[in-house]
Amino acid sequence: MPTLADHQTEKARLQAIAAKREFDEAVAATRAADDLRQAALAVRDLLMAALAEIPERFAEAIASERDETRVHYLLSDAVHSLLERIGRQAEQACAALPEFGERFRHGSRPRDLLTVSQWADRHRWITSGTNAPGKWRTELTPYLRDIMDDLSEHSPVDTVVVQKASGLGGTEALYNWIGYDMHHLGNRDMLIVVPTLELRDRSFNPRLAKMIDECPVLSALVSRASRSSANRVDILEYGANARIIKAGANSADSLRSDHVPNVACDEVSAYKWSVGGEGDPMTLIANRQRTFTRRKTLLNSTPTNEGECRIDQAYKRSNRQRYHVPCPHCGEYQHLDFRNNFKYRTAIDEDISPGDQHKTVVAAWYVCRHCGAEIQEGDKTAMLAAGRWIAERPYIKRRHGYQINGLYAPIGLGLTWVDIAQRWVDAQNDSTKLQAFVNTDLGEVWKEEGDGADATSLLARVENYSRESLEAAGRLLRVVAWTDV
């Protein structure tokens, strides 16, 4: 049986063990504090050295570059590489605290400088509803690359205007931007506006849900419950409380969302000029972005009538770009002009009575405006791949406008040149068909024909006559006023 002395000895032993443990913990804490202090000093020195070299690195990056857009991209690249280097060096300097160094490197690492087109090429899938199912390939529609890349987070462009013919992929570029914002940026609210709430529910929502289901990186961000919930017709929540707000331009209430940095307006030429007695919907939309300096807006539409076409007015305020492609014979660049250089040949059905005979287009080609050689549609794929956008007003840097017609439709993904020529032939002597052709196939505004007076010439004929002078001359018979609406 243990004696009192045995109990006292055991108590002393346990006290000694506890004292040693406390001492070891104090020493470890002191060492950890010293290691942390040394790591913090090392990181501080790295940051101070990096800040000191920024001016030289920036000057070296842009060198003699004068293009504002290129300067923006080059500076972004310089900052990106500098932050990555700091992260690596900090991890090495904090070898005594590997977890601290790893966390600092991870926290200082910037997002990849990914463009919208690069994101689409990596992550976008289209399984149905297209002539080219499978993984998205920007190379099939190369004219969309610059349009999408202007919407990238590190692009200096804040407004992108696309005036286009139907069936050229403009709306798919919009969906790629949505996917880019959801997956790559992850925390940016976005407002999508279509002409009406009915169109939102009938067309946009199903297409958006389809894209999310087809892209694994997007479907992972959106819960199945939120996608099927009845109260999600106007808002899609994803990721860390980010939202896509879906509105109709015919509803002022739907445009009263919280402030958002990014806005996409599809088919803007179909928007009403006043909504709900509250004025222009485009003004209401712009008000949602006013608190953001790094905002982006996409305006996408086929045009309508001259003088009342929103997309045409927006394009005229932009830098006005057209897609130029090289002639396969002489190599000179030109934009494809339907009215002046597009040619076709027709044949008349001989087995039909003269009054019912129909002209059938049997061939179509393009004539180079530089060398006069005939360009066949089979040359178009290589021409599109080598094409480039050329601005009429290159001095406008932040508002990029793109105009493109149906002649550029990739082979197998749209109307052929023969199809377009046939639609032109069929539209003759029918103003409604002709208007649809001009708007949807040429991507141009429809101009009503008539004998209206030129405004400038009319104003030049204005003269002032006082009532007294006319009465004195005995020439005042009556005053007539009229208006023509």
Give residue ranges: language-model regions.
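Phosphate/NTP-binding elements of NTP-utilizing enzymes
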Residues: 94-483
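Protein-protein interaction interfaces in oligomeric scaffolds
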Residues: 2-95
